[in-house]
């Protein structure tokens, strides 16, 4: 913690960044109790501060700071941190890490305007809603170069740390700024950019570019100017924020080797397009629209043809149009100048404004509906003319494209009519698309401008993205944002604990790694995995008929119940509808999927897009140049056949995922820093903080998640020296004094000696680490120890003070000795004559009076003794009474407990009875269900019986139909024979025409062979007819089997009947048992009532006892008061005696004076005086002893009195508690009595219900009996039917025998006819198949021709492709190797020990280089082998030209080539794996290789890559060389040589690449055919890629673990110079290899040209073959048409017959189903109506009960009011009594004053009495006695008044207690009323639901009726069609016969 002097460099910002020293000291010295100071959960404030009052039974009573007392559970109380942690800068350092501690720390810092706070790795910033001087230039300079712990929390500190890490660690950095809208993300992003622009300036001045004529700024200016431009087009006013960024951005600022700015680029995410066309009332659209209309630049208004009123444009005026905090005119100037600074041309600038104006005009486009049509037409063309002019389009074409877009249907384009709604939606979509594409184009243009082409080394990325969003209505945008945050949180969790683990590693702590990134894996996989939400959404977007419901159903099928993070949302009234819920790390979010498919597809009017592409405005045409329309695809399909089909259709979610993956890969390659922005309140009030809002954001931002992760490890850590200093107090003896001991050892000894959990801490190298909470425990122990030490010091202080007091006492003793000495001196003097005279005369005076006074004092003393004895006796009596009362109380408690146990037993019995009742009801239900099942079985039997009868009738019909079909078949046979003859003649003619072409002849011969096969198939069909006969026989057997089943069913029914009878008996027995139990219950109830009455009487007795006890207590209190009065009187008498003693002493003094005046006296008088003096002294001593005894007795009395009062008070309290308990028990007993009464009622009701049930059961039994009788009758009918069926079956069997005889006669003929029929059918089908096959063959031959045209090219290029694949694989190997090697360089700390073996490793490296060269040579050999194979393939192509029949053979060769390619790929993959293994094994050795050697290896491997990134990689290598700085100055010469060589290699490579590109253009056409084959290969490659990715991840982990080895590498760089010469030699070898590769490329070009010539020749041959095929196809088409005509007629007739038969059966089935459903619905409806009636009766009963309760409540309220009035009356009386007591008090004071006056007079009188005589004294004494009597009487009256006052106060207390009890009763009744009202509401709701259900059932019933009617109509129609078809078939049959 820095001092105030160190904070002075921050200037006026210092108090806003850190507490002053004074505040810190005050905070540490503030009193604090760790055990009682807590945070407590509170519903309004979320958490409040408080102190623990008590803890009991898992509940804690806490008193809050506001004074309220809360009783909560233990888990709702959180311990408070010690004061030294107040306003702590890093919240992770707190001893108690929990939500309230974090919240209050932020709140207290925010109250002090310290808006930045660390939380572990996070920097949390709270929006201050006002300007603070914390961003001044002096603050920037103050933070420059400071470590995080050296300066207070700030965004500049985060930025500077990132900058310093980048320079020192040579690693890319990123700053992730997240938070809700309005939290200050954009402001903090600006500050970060401002900081980097200030500290890393390049020093260049502004330039004027002569070429463009526009002013351009420096790179710093451009980076800063990018912000206003992006804000103008991407920011808008929202409810929370006036300047809210409606897009996310990732700004990369690139730096050079020296840390200066090199370049920058921006990536944007999730622009809110919908804001272009729609805004909420309190919001507005993007700022640019209002800047343009602000009229700051009138030329813009004229150019864009707009007005200055935004309300003229609906797209931008749906919400607000102005913002108080934004000046649109000034902002327009800033935007315009930003466009100029960023280097946009004048044309681009104009096009930006024009497109923005066109979007505004689009909102004014109006369309109307044509009369009598749904077609839309434009309503005026003025607006369209303006919009088209601004976009350089034809307005007529634009309107036509909007109203009549061209749509592709099949291979043709059709103009489609659009409705008004469709057109308006299309216009909105176009406006959004234009604006979005323009925004993205602007970002790319800014990136181009910011790319200065300067050498750049590393970058710092600033991510400004929306935080987690949980709204009432969450759509696709929220899912994307939340998914992004989920990924970022996973990234943070992983990164945070990686750093924690590194800290543990550094400190040498044993720790098993926990990857908290996996905590969120379930949710992330649910969203992005192959069958996750996004993939299902994209899949649904591919289907044309997909809807939101189908998407929802798919989600539910795939994830509901399978994934824990996917849930069905709860329906909440008043909230927006939700379709599914996801459990994110920040909470559960309900998503609404409405419109997701449209949002994801983002459809545009393709016709308008085509217009945009043809626009003369270059910018607009460029914006839509990438869009692939259907027309463009149709026109360019032949040219661009190689393009992927799905490239034009990329969904929003896929694009988002692609961008997100890019972002995550960028972030993973950086060292991240996290900033979380927080909104303190919704009202934008500075300094105010809403607890719930902030907590919600902390959860969403992952701050609390970070704390959770922190708590898993060791969040608290202290340096050993600090720990020793602070906690040495706990056990000072553990650390030996007088000798030096290391702080670590001291800490270890200290912790070992303390009684704590030793697993909760770990010892590091420099610090001791603690688990969360342990440090707080140590703090408590320290506080306790300090308390003990303080008490010891206090004891010592007290001892010292006591010694001082003792010293004083000694001094007093010495002074007493001095006094004694003086007395002794007096004793010596007393023998003087004068003194003797004095002693003699003094006792004579007033001796009589003193004797009397002594006598009176003795009497009073005796009286006090007697009274004391009496009071002690009374006290004993009271104590005995107390003992008896306690015994009685205990007896009463035991009785109450016994009664409570009895009640509990009664309740248990009641519960058992209720359970038995429920069981019986369940049994009754089972019985009824069985009965219903039996009825269903009956119904099924009857249905089966009907079905059997129907099947019998159908069998008869089938036999008749078979006979008819036999006759038809014979007729059809003759007709088909004639047709066959005609066909054979036609075939002969065709054979003559196709005689020239041998191939077609063979095909026709094959067709002839197929017809023969068809004839064979016809014979097979005849066999099937015989099988059909067998099937019929089987059906008869089945019928017999079904009859047997009927018998079995009947047996089952009989068994079920017996079961039912048994169940009935059981039910009757159970009813009897229920009645018995009911009687027992009645008896028990009577017993209970008797017990209750006994209890009532006992309670009344107890109440009477209580009253008596209260009376006794009151009497005792009165007695106590009397004793107090007596004590007071005693005190008064004592005061009197003391007064008299003082008077006597005064008189003695006067007498002595008189004696001295009088002179001498007689010796007798002196002796008398001596005697009297002795007596007087004796009396004085007695008096003093008496007074001492009196005081002692008074003190003991007071003590006893106080004790007895306290005991009596406790007894009174106990008795009051007992009374309250008894009253409560009484009320509970009353309630229990009521409950028992209600139970009795319920039992009686249950009894009634059971009786009803019995009756219903009896009715059911009777019904069952009747049903059983009916079933018996049915069984009898079935037996008769069975007999009839048996006879019929006998007849059928006889008929079958006859028919079989006929069939046996006709079977041969039938078989022959059926064979012929089937042959003809087969012939027709085969002719159709042949036609189709020929058509397909034609198409395939055409396709094959196309294939053959390009086959030679394909064969030629396959070689090149394989070669490229090999080179690619080699380059991948090289890439991996370079990656691993370059990464491995950065982690070489672990290899310090292996320095000595450097020479050996260098030799191994050389061997490795030789091995690589050998591999290159082997690859060249494979390349040659491939060339040879290509030549072979060319020979194969020549052979394929000989004949088309060899195509199959060629395909097999191609497959072989593919297999070889695969094998080669596997070989290359195996080589890759081997190289990876080698890389892993040699990795440890390669770490010590020098920079120059690595650069040369990089050169070697980059040469092999043959890609366009060679320039970039070489520049990277040169930059890596430059990293060495001054040390590696000598290597610059080598760098120049490498650059020269690089330029030569580059030139050679560019030539090779140009030739390769030329070849690739031709290969694209061949790739179309190869795609099918490649897809399989790609899949395997993808699998291998996944394996490689896995290997990547593993290696990345290895690389990360090697990061710590960098320091050793820096030390070893000096040795690199020695290897320089060797590397130069390697470079020369690489040049040779490059030349060799160039020669190979030249040879490949020559081969390619040769193959082109061969391909041209083959093309000519293919054209000739195609012409011949086309002639054949035309001839085939003629034959097919004739065959089709004949086949169509036959097929139509058959199809219609079958269809009608099927429809008839379906209709009959539907009829049966519908009737059954109708019956079911009817029964359901009746049952629902009954339940509704029951519910209505229950509701009426409850309403009556509720009215009674309300009446009772009103009565109670009236009673309460009366009690309150009584209390008021009593209060008034009390006031009166108080007034009277005050008056008496005043009187008392007056009397006391008079007494004092009288006393004064008495003194005067005594003085006079000495002179005047005894009579006057006696009179005055009498007067004094009278006055004393009056005073005593007045005192008694006063005491009585006080007693009365106390009585009234007690009465008032009783009344207040009674009022409180009444109030509680009222509240109880109110609760009861509320509960009953809730019950009523629930019953009403049930009734409503029942009504709804009945209504739905009615609607279902009506619907089914309607369906039934429709089914009947359909059946009628089907029957009529069947009849018509039968008539038609007969007519056809007659025609055929007539033709024959």
From Swiss-Prot:
The modification Phosphoserine is found at residues 392, 625, 1093, 1097, 1163, 1238, 1244, 1262, 1289, 1293, 1304, 1307, 1475, 1496, 1515, 1543, 1555, 1575, 1601, 1715, 1727, 1740. Residues 786-815 form the IQ domain. One of its GO terms (cellular component) is A band. Residues 1154-1173, 1884-1920 are annotated as: Disordered. Residues 844-1940 form a coiled coil. The keyword Disulfide bond does not apply. Pfam families: Myosin_head, Myosin_N, Myosin_tail_1. The modification Pros-methylhistidine is found at residue 758. SUPFAM superfamilies: Myosin rod fragments, P-loop containing nucleoside triphosphate hydrolases, Tropomyosin. It is found in: Cytoplasm, Myofibril. Keywords: Actin-binding, ATP-binding, Calmodulin-binding, Coiled coil, Cytoplasm, Methylation, Motor protein, Muscle protein, Myosin, Nucleotide-binding, Phosphoprotein, Thick filament. Residues 33-82 form the Myosin N-terminal SH3-like domain. The keyword Magnesium does not apply. GO terms for biological process: actin-mediated cell contraction; muscle contraction; plasma membrane repair; response to muscle activity. Residues 660-682, 762-776 are annotated as: Actin-binding. It comes from the Eukaryota. GO terms for molecular function: actin filament binding; ATP binding; calmodulin binding; microfilament motor activity. The modification Phosphotyrosine is found at residues 389, 1465, 1493. Its main location: cytoplasm. ATP binds at residues 179-186. Muscle myosin is a hexameric protein that consists of 2 heavy chain subunits (MHC), 2 alkali light chain subunits (MLC) and 2 regulatory light chain subunits (MLC-2). Interacts with GCSAM. Myosins are actin-based motor molecules with ATPase activity essential for muscle contraction. Belongs to the TRAFAC class myosin-kinesin ATPase superfamily. Myosin family. This is Myosin-2. It comes from Canis lupus familiaris (Dog). The gene is MYH2.
């Amino acid at each position: 913690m820095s001092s105030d002097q160190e904070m002075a460099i921050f200037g006026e910002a210092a108090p806003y960044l850190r507490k002053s020293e004074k505040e810190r000291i005050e905070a540490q010295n503030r009193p604090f109790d760790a055990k009682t100071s807590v945070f407590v959960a509170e519903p309004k404030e979320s958490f409040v501060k408080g102190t623990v009052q008590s803890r009991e039974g898992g509940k804690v009573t806490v008193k809050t700071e506001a004074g309220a007392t809360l009783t909560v559970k233990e888990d709702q109380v959180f311990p408070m941190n010690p004061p030294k942690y107040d306003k702590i800068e890093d919240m992770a350092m707190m001893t108690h890490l929990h939500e309230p501690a974090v919240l209050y720390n932020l709140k207290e810092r925010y109250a002090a305007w310290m808006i930045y706070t660390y939380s572990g790795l996070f920097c949390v910033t709270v929006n201050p809603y006002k300007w603070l001087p914390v961003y001044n230039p002096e603050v920037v300079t103050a933070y420059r170069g400071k470590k995080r712990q050296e300066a207070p929390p700030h965004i500049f500190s985060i930025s500077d740390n990132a900058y310093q890490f980048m320079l020192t660690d040579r690693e890319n950095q990123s700053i992730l700024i997240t938070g809700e809208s309005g939290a200050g993300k954009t402001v903090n992003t600006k500050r970060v950019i401002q900081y980097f622009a200030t500290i890393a300036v390049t020093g260049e001045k502004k330039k004027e570019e002569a070429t463009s004529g526009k002013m351009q700024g420096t790179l710093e200016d451009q980076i800063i100017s990018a912000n206003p431009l992006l804000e103008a087009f991407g920011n808008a006013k929202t409810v929370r924020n006036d300047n809210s960024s409606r897009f996310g951005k990732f700004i990369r600022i690139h730096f050079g080797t020296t840390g200066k700015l090199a370049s920058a680029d921006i990536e944007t995410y999730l622009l809110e397009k919908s804001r272009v066309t729609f805004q909420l009332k309190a919001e507005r659209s993007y700022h640019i629209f209002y800047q343009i209309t602000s009229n700051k630049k009138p030329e813009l208004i004229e150019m864009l043809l707009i007005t200055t009123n935004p309300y003229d444009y609906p797209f931008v005026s749906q919400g607000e149009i102005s913002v108080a905090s934004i000046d649109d005119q000034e902002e327009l100037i800033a935007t315009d100048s930003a466009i100029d600074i960023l280097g946009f041309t004048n044309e681009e600038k104009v096009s930006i404004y024009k497109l923005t104006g066109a979007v505004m005009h689009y909102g004014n486009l109006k369309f109307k509906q044509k009369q009598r049509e749904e077609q839309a037409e434009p309503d005026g063309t003025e607006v369209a003319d303006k919009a088209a002019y601004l976009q350089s389009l034809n307005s007529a074409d634009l309107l036509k494209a909007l109203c009549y877009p061209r749509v592709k249907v099949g291979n043709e384009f059709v103009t489609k009519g659009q409705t008004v709604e469709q057109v308006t939606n299309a216009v909105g979509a176009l406006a959004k698309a234009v604006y979005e594409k323009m925004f993205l184009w602007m970002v790319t243009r800014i990136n181009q401008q910011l790319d200065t082409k300067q050498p750049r080394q590393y970058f710092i990325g600033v991510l400004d993205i929306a935080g987690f969003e949980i709204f009432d209505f969450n759509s696709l945008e929220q899912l994307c944002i939340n998914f992004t945050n989920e990924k970022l949180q996973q990234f943070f969790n992983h990164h945070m604990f990686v750093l924690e683990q590194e800290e543990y590693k550094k400190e040498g702590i044993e720790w098993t790694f926990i990857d908290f990134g996996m905590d969120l894996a379930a949710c992330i996989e649910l969203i992005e995995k192959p069958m996750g939400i996004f993939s299902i959404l994209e899949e649904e977007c591919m289907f044309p008929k997909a809807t939101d419901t189908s998407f929802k159903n798919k989600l539910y099928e795939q994830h509901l119940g399978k994934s824990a993070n996917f849930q069905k949302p709860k329906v909440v009234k008043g909230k927006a509808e939700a379709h599914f819920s996801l459990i994110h790390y920040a909470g559960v979010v309900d998503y609404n999927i409405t419109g997701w498919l449209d949002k994801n597809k983002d459809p545009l009017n393709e016709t308008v897009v085509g217009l945009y592409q043809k626009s003369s405005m270059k910018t607009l045409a460029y914006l839509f140049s990438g869009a692939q329309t259907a027309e463009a695809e149709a026109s360019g399909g032949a040219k661009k056949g190689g393009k992927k089909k799905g490239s034009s259709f990329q969904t929003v979610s896929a694009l988002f995922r692609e961008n997100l993956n890019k972002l995550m890969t960028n972030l993973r390659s950086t060292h991240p820093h996290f900033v979380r922005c927080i909104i303190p309140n919704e009202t934008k009030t500075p300094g105010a903080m809403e607890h719930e809002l902030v907590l919600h954001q902390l959860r969403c931002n992952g701050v609390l998640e970070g704390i959770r992760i922190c708590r898993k490890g060791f969040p608290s850590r202290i340096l050993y020296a600090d720990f020793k200093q602070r906690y040495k107090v706990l056990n000072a003896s553990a650390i030996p004094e007088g000798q030096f001991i290391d702080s670590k050892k001291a800490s270890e000894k200290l912790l070992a000696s303390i009684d704590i959990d030793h697993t909760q801490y770990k010892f590091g190298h420099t610090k001791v680490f603690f688990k969360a909470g342990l440090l707080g425990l140590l703090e408590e122990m320290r506080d306790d120890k300090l308390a003990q030490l303080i008490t010891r010091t206090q004891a010592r202080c007290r001892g010292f003070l006591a010694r001082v007091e003792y010293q004083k006492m000694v001094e007093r003793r010495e002074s007493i000795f001095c006094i004694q000495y003086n007395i002794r001196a007096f004793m010596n003097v007393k023998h003087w004559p004068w003194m003797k005279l004095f002693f003699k005369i003094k006792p004579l005076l007033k001796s009589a009076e003193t004797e009397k006074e002594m006598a009176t004092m003795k009497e009073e003393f005796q009286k006090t003794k007697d009274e004391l004895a009496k009071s002690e006796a009374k006290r004993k009596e009271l104590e005995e009474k107390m003992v008896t009362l306690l015994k009685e109380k205990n007896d009463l408690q035991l009785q109450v407990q016994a009664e409570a146990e009895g009640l509990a037993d009664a309740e248990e019995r009641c519960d058992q009875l209720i359970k038995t009742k429920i069981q019986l009801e369940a049994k009754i239900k089972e019985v009824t269900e069985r009965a219903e099942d039996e009825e269903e079985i009956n119904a099924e039997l009857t249905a089966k019986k009907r079905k059997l009868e129907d099947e019998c009738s159908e069998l008869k019909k089938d036999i008749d139909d078979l006979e008819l079909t036999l006759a038809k078949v014979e007729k059809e046979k003759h007709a088909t024979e004639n047709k066959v003859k005609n066909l054979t003649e036609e075939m002969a003619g065709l054979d003559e025409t196709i005689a020239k072409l041998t191939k077609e002849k063979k095909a026709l011969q094959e067709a002839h062979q197929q017809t023969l096969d068809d004839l064979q198939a016809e014979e097979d069909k005849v066999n099937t007819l015989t099988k059909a006969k067998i099937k019929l026989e089987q059906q008869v057997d089945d019928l017999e089997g079904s009859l047997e089943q009927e018998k079995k069913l009947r047996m089952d029914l009989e068994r079920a009947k017996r079961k039912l009878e048994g169940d009935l008996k059981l039910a009757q027995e159970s009813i009897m048992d229920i009645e018995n139990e009911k009687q027992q219950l009645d008896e028990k109830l009577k017993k209970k009532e008797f017990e209750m009455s006994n209890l009532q009487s006992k309670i009344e007795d107890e109440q009477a006892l209580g009253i008596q006890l209260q009376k006794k207590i009151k009497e005792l209190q009165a007695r106590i008061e009397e004793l107090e009065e007596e004590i007071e009187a005693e005190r008064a008498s004592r005061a009197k005696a003391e007064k008299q003693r003082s008077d006597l002493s005064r008189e003695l003094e006067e007498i002595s004076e008189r004696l001295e005046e009088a002179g001498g006296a007689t010796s007798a008088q002196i002796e008398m005086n001596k005697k009297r003096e002795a007596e007087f002294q004796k009396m004085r001593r007695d008096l003093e002893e008496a007074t001492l005894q009196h005081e002692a007795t008074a003190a003991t009395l007071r003590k006893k009195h106080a004790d007895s009062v306290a005991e009596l008070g406790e007894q009174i309290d106990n008795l009051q508690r007992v009374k309250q308990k008894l009253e409560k028990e009484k009320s509970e007993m009353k309630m229990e009595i009521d409950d028992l009464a209600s139970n009795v009622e319920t039992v009686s009701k249950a009894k009634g219900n059971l009786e009803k049930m019995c009756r219903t059961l009896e009715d059911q039994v009777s019904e069952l009996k009747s049903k059983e009788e009916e079933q018996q009758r049915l069984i009898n009918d079935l037996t008769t039917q069975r007999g009839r069926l048996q006879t019929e079956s006998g007849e059928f069997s006889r008929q079958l025998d006859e028919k079989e005889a006929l069939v046996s006669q006709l079977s041969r003929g039938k078989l022959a006819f059926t064979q012929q029929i089937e042959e003809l059918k087969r012939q027709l089908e085969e002719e159709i198949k042949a036609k189709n096959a020929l058509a397909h063959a034609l198409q395939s031959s055409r396709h094959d021709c196309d294939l053959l045209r390009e086959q030679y090219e394909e064969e030629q290029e396959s070689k090149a492709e394989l070669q490229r694949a090999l080179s690619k694989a080699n380059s991948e190997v090289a890439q991996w190797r370079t990656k691993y090697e370059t990464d491995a360089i950065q982690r070489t700390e672990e290899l310090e020990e292996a320095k000595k073996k450097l020479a050996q490793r260098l030799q191994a490296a050389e061997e490795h280089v030789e091995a690589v060269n050998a591999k290159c040579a082997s690859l060249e050999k494979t390349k040659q082998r491939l060339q040879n194979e290509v030549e072979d393939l060319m020979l194969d192509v020549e052979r394929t030209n000989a004949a088309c029949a060899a195509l199959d053979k060629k395909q097999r060769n191609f497959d072989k080539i593919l297999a070889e390619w695969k094998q080669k790929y596997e070989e290359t993959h195996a080589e890759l794996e081997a190289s990876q293994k080698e890389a892993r094994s040699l990795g440890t050795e390669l770490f010590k290789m020098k920079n120059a050697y690595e650069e040369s290896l990089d050169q070697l491997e980059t040469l092999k890559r043959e890609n366009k990134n060679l320039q970039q990689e070489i520049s990277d290598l040169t930059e890596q060389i430059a990293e060495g700085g001054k040390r590696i100055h000598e290597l610059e010469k080598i760098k120049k040589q490498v650059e020269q060589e690089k330029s030569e290699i580059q030139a050679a490579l560019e030539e090779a690449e140009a030739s390769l590109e030329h070849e690739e253009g031709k290969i694209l056409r061949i790739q179309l055919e190869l795609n099918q084959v490649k897809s399989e290969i790609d899949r395997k490659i993808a699998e291998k890629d996944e394996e490689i990715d896995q290997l990547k991840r593993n290696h990345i982990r290895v690389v990360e673990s090697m990061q710590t080895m960098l320091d050793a590498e820096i030390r070893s760089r000096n040795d690199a110079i020695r290897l320089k010469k060797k590397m130069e030699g390697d470079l020369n070898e690489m040049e040779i290899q490059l030349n060799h590769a160039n020669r190979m490329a030249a040879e490949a070009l020559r081969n390619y040209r040769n193959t082109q010539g061969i391909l041209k020749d083959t093309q000519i041959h293919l054209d000739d073959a195609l012409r011949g095929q086309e002639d054949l196809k035309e001839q085939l088409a003629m034959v097919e048409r004739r065959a089709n005509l004949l086949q169509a007629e036959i097929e139509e007739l058959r199809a219609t017959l079958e269809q009608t038969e099927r429809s008839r059966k379906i209709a009959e089935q539907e009829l049966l189903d519908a009737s059954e459903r109708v019956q079911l619905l009817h029964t359901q409806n009746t049952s629902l109506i009954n339940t509704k009636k029951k519910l209505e009766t229950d509701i009426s009963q409850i309403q009556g009960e509720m009215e009674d309760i309300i009446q009772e409540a009103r009565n109670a309220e009236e009673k309460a009011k009366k009690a309150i009035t009584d209390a008021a009356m009593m209060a008034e009386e009390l006031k009166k009594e108080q007034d009277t007591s005050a008056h008496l008090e005043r009187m008392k004071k007056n009397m006391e004053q008079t007494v004092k006056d009288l006393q004064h007079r008495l003194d005067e009188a005594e003085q006079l009495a000495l002179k005047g005589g005894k009579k006057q004294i006696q009179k005055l004494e009498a007067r004094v006695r009278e006055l004393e009597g009056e005073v005593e009487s007045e005192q008694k009256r006063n005491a009585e008044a006080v007693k009365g006052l106390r009585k009234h106060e007690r009465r008032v207390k009783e009344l207040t207690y009674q009022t409180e009890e009444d109030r509680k009763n009222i509240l109880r009744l109110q609760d009861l009323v509320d509960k009953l009202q809730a019950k009523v509401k629930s019953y009403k709701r049930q009734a409503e639901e029942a009504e709804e259900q009945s209504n739905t059932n009615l609607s279902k019933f009506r619907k089914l009726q309607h369906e039934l009617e429709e089914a009947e109509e359909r059946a009628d129609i089907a029957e009529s069609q069947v009849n018509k078809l039968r008539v038609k078939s007969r007519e056809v049959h007659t025609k055929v016969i007539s033709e024959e």
